[in-house]
Amino acid sequence: MKKLFIVIAMALFSGATFAQQNVFAHKVRVGETLYSISQMYGVTVNDIKKENAGLTDNIMAGQSINVPQSPTGELHYTIQAGETLYSISKKFGVTSKVITDANPGLSATNFKSGTLIVIPRGVYSTADQRKQDIAAPKERTGCKLTHLVAKKETVYSISKLYNVTQADLIKANPVLKDSKLKKGMTLCIPYPQDERYYTPSDNEVFSEIARQKGVKYDRIKVAVILPFGLDRRTSEANKMTDLYKGFLLAVDSIKDSGANIDIYAYEEKGSDAASIQGILDNPEMKEMNLIVGPVRPEHIDAVAQFAHVNNIVNVIPTSTKVNAVNSHKTSFQVNSPQNYTNSFVYEKFLELNSGANVVFVNMSDKSDYADYLWGFKKYLESKNVSFVSMQFAAIENIAKHLKKGTRNIIIPSASSAAAFEQLVNEFNTLNLLDNFQLSLFGYPDWQTFSDNNEKMLDKYKCSYYTTFFSDEAKQRVANFNYRFRHNFKKAQIASCPKFGELGYDIGAFFVGGINNFGGGFMQNVDKVKYTSLQNPFNFVRKNNWSGFENTVVMFINYKGNDMIEIQRYE
């Protein structure tokens, strides 16, 4: 198939008192709910509703809501006009490093009035630590300017001319201790007392922080924690083994450039906390620069917390139903949370299909997308968009729900190949395209049968959303598949997504990024240049103290005439 690709706290804080911010503002992001927001800030949904008269559970992206301070968690503070990193650190009796370490997403660019940050409770910086703070006032050394001595000038007259003391002038020019002032001498004029100290700008402070963190590693140490199934081979184990194999291929490519990389593989067993803690207790774990895994939800928080405390990049490779990134600054969630993806799809679908007639068809097959479809309908209702829901059993009557002269978009409730084929076969029998503009909107699973149903996908100009897409016709994908078969004597397991490619994308992006940026990887994640085989990445912090979520969502559109359009959003 010819393919066209378009990548479109009153709180007492270490002895410092300050005006309390009892409530702070939160701007709702796509996919967030009152519950997820309450969990993020350590308060209850009712606590939030008490601060927002009339607030319902139906919140929208972009909406601003008031959130009360948690009595036990970190203090949330909104930067005020005119404040600097140093002035805030003085207010809370801590160093600027305490603040920037707690808010790794903070930068000179977003340090401005209205920005929300966290201040760790119970942290105190000594007077000596605050004096050594990179944001603290610094003494200017050297000469402010030079002066050519004229006839009849004296040390006294020159010191008065430049508002410096005679002692300071002599100190800056030791020759004056032993020699008299002479015409033609060039003197160093020191800074006056009122100009002797200066406070570094926020730009200077953040630049220095970045410089200190950006030290490259002589050797990169990586831990991979996956359920390899060493005791018992399962479908999950086979997929995770493919992921590991793809990861190793990426690492080998990076090693070819001269990088020194050590891989430590650990078997993820069971679902109890003790099994994962046994891995984390290994002395070498604290030396890791990257931890890939685990994949089981019961283990993710423990590893994320360990990585958070030890400043280790932690990749959550598969789960969409965890919230580790909310409170763990070094966590990266490869698969966007389902709420985010769903909400994004609803909004983008309506934006792209304004005015279309939408028909939901309830198929006989069981749906794995019941929550998604329920949310889809609720979203359309909230936007006053009418739609039709009908049973597949009455499909012969679908024409009465379709409209001529406008686009009709059919959304089946099931994502299987059988459901798709059943539906389009009925459409063919009814010759619907003779009288109506008709298209189907589906699911990521449609990739599993796209090769066998290419003609029908093209005929009905089908579209589906996904966060991953592998194009077998791309030379890079073909080359990867050859390397995989050549190195491991077997092809990737047929699955959706393909776990070998997922592993390669994770390895190339994270190990490659850490190799290039060292300890500054998280501050430079947006500068990592990598074109994915299957899983495109755009990692964004939810806030200044959180970890990262991958925000990429794609729409795959069959345009007819053997053309495919890929619309990438992030």
What are the residue ranges of the model-derived segments?
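Bacterial Sec-dependent N-terminal signal peptides
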Residues: M1-K27, E565-E570
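Primarily a LysM-type cell-wall glycan-binding module
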Residues: F18-G42, Q69-T95, Q132-T165
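Residue-level recognition of short, solvent-exposed, well-ordered loop/turn junctions
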Residues: R29, I59-Q63, Q80, T109-T115, ...
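N-terminal, post-signal-peptide region of Sec/Tat-exported proteins
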Residues: Q39-H76, F111-K112, L176, L181
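N-terminal post-signal-peptidase region of extra-cytosolic proteins
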Residues: N46-A53, K97-P104, A167-L176, V424-F427
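Extracytosolic ligand-binding ectodomains
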Residues: Y124-N163, A167-D168, A172-E570
